[in-house]
Structures are given as structure tokens and as C-alpha cells.
Swiss-Prot record:
Protein family membership: Belongs to the cyclin family. Cyclin G subfamily.
GO CC annotation: nucleus
Cysteine disulfide links: none
Domain of life of the organism encoding this protein: Eukaryota
Reported function: May play a role in growth regulation. Is associated with G2/M phase arrest in response to DNA damage. May be an intermediate by which p53 mediates its role as an inhibitor of cellular proliferation.
Tagged with keyword Cell cycle: yes
CDD domains from the UniProt entry: CYCLIN_CCNG1
Main subcellular location of this protein, as a coarse class: nucleus
Organism this protein belongs to: Pongo abelii
Lineage, highest ranks first: Eukaryota, Metazoa, Chordata, Craniata, Vertebrata
Gene3D superfamilies, sorted: Cyclin-like (1.10.472.10)
Full protein name: Cyclin-G1
């Protein structure tokens, strides 16, 4: 049982979980603001769910291009949705808003040596605004999120839940659940605005619970129930979001869903620009396909 694990590592993880749960409600998007975006008609003048989702896919492409952590992407999405749920953003300004949120997340999470120059980031993103525009928008975003860049994200819960479940398994069974696959599933969910209305803990547990069902890891079912209890997650809420996650992942795996395309970033980097960029910038990562499990 997770709640009675006595190893030092387990106790540290449980302490971290309690701290995250305590902070969870802070620095999250306004649900009422997200609903307004979802209900908006696509007339070219108002922010819509479709435009928001396309912007997040572009941010995911940048994350893959630069080789940044999923945590960076998750925080960028949090910042973007917090801003969009508060402000009436015109579609023509969305690119600058999105890149500003992304850059804030990068500077907050990534090592300083891996942070790209603003000029390089704008060029690779294929935008026409200036560094001054980006810096000005950064300041606006910071003011509207009350200068609170750090936030509790679904990725943090995903890491903790996964680690706690691993502690509950014998060594020979710890490879049954692939964390990279869970990360890819979370990225897919982030590309849909509806999942920003879910509590980060609920979204993370929904993804893990579905994966455990899919891989038939029955020995972890009790662990999921313990995590649900520890996190004070309502059973109906968990079922509701699991169904939405399942639908999202099914659509994401189909040809109907437009996936982030990091390859388009590859072609706009000239030879001169490529030589000027740090080597780590020019690693073209694979598209964020959800990896298959090895039987």
C-alpha cells in the first residue's frame, strides 16, 4: 500500500505530493475564461479554442526542436492559458503571447546555457515581430499572472505518481509502464484546451490509470486507488476525465488529428543561422508520437 511505504525515498515522495496538492489550486487558468474561449465563434476577431490549440501545437514543435523538457512545455501551456483566461487576446497577437509564455517557461526551467537568444527564437518561430515586441509582451504576461511564473503542473504530478507506483513494484516489474509514453500522452492532452479545465492532479492520474488498464498491470490498480485517496480525487471526476483522455488519445493516434510538425522549423534555418546557433539548438527531434509498448 502506497500510504504505508516506509522507505526514505517513498516518504520524500509523499511529502512532495502533499506539498503539490496544497499548492495545486494556485496559479491555474480561470475555468470561466476558458469556457468563454471554447464558446467563441471563429470570426477572425476573437480567440477560439481552435486557435489556442494550434498555438500550443506550435509551442510543442519548438519544445521538440530545441530538445527542451516536457516540464518546460507544461509550464508554457499553463502560462498561456492563465493569460488567455484573463485577457481578451486578438488572434493577431496570439503568436507573440504564446512565444512570450514559452520563453518565460524556458528561462524558468532550462539551464541557462540552453536558453536561446530571443532573436533566434523569433526567427526559428517564423514570426515578424521584434525582440522589443517580445520583451514588452513578456512584461504584460508577467503583470497579468502577478509575476508568478512557477506553477503546479500536470507534469509534476505525473512524475510523482509514476515514482510512487514504481516504489510499489518489485524491480523486475518496474519497466512495465513507460514514462516516455505517459509524457507523450500528456503532451497530446495539453494540445486540447478542455484539459486545462481539469485539475493537474486529476489529469495526471487519469493518464496513468488509463495506461495501467491498457497494459493490464492489475497489481497497480490498488496503487491507483491509494493515489486517488491521497489526492482526494472524486471517483466520478476521475472517470469523467479518463473518458475524455481516452477519446483524445484515440483521435491523436488517428490520421484525422493534425500533429505538431517540428520539420517545418528545420527548413527556415539558413546555413549562416545554423552556424551561429548553439549546436544543441539544431537537433531536430522526432515528432511527439506516443511510443508503443514493447511486449
Amino acid at each position: 500500500m502506497i500510504e504505508v511505504l516506509t522507505t526514505t525515498d517513498s516518504q520524500k515522495l509523499l511529502h512532495q505530493l502533499n506539498a503539490l496538492l496544497e499548492q495545486e489550486s494556485r496559479c491555474q487558468p480561470k475555468v470561466c475564461g476558458l469556457r468563454l474561449i471554447e464558446s467563441a465563434h471563429d470570426n477572425g476577431l476573437r480567440m477560439t479554442a481552435r486557435l489556442r490549440d494550434f498555438e500550443v501545437k506550435d509551442l510543442l514543435s519548438l519544445t521538440q526542436f530545441f530538445g527542451f523538457d516536457t516540464e518546460t512545455f507544461s509550464l508554457a501551456v499553463n502560462l498561456l492559458d492563465r493569460f488567455l483566461s484573463k485577457m481578451k487576446v486578438q488572434p493577431k497577437h496570439l503568436g507573440c503571447v504564446g512565444l512570450s509564455c514559452f520563453y518565460l517557461a524556458v528561462k524558468s526551467i532550462e539551464e541557462e546555457r540552453n536558453v536561446p537568444l530571443a532573436t533566434d527564437l523569433i526567427r526559428i518561430s517564423q514570426y515578424r515581430f521584434t525582440v522589443s515586441d517580445l520583451m514588452r509582451m513578456e512584461k504584460i504576461v508577467l503583470e497579468k499572472v502577478c509575476w508568478k511564473v512557477k506553477a503546479t503542473t500536470a507534469f509534476q504530478f505525473l512524475q510523482l505518481y509514476y515514482s510512487l507506483l514504481q516504489e510499489n513494484l518489485p524491480l523486475e516489474r518496474r519497466n512495465n509502464i513507460n514514462f516516455e509514453r505517459l509524457e507523450a500522452q500528456l503532451k497530446a492532452c495539453h494540445c486540447r484546451i478542455i484539459f486545462s479545465k481539469a485539475k493537474p492532479s486529476v489529469l495526471a492520474l487519469s493518464i496513468i490509470a488509463l495506461e495501467i488498464q491498457a497494459q493490464k498491470c492489475v497489481e497497480l490498480t490498488e496503487g491507483i486507488e491509494c493515489l486517488q485517496k491521497l489526492s482526494k480525487i472524486n471517483g466520478r471526476d476521475l472517470t469523467f476525465w479518463q473518458e475524455l483522455v481516452s477519446k483524445c488519445l484515440t483521435e491523436y493516434s488517428s490520421n484525422k488529428c493534425s500533429k505538431p510538425n517540428v520539420q517545418k522549423l528545420k527548413w527556415i534555418v539558413s546555413g549562416r543561422t545554423a552556424r551561429q546557433l548553439k549546436h544543441s539548438y539544431y537537433r531536430i527531434a522526432h515528432l511527439p508520437t506516443i511510443p508503443e509498448m514493447v511486449p
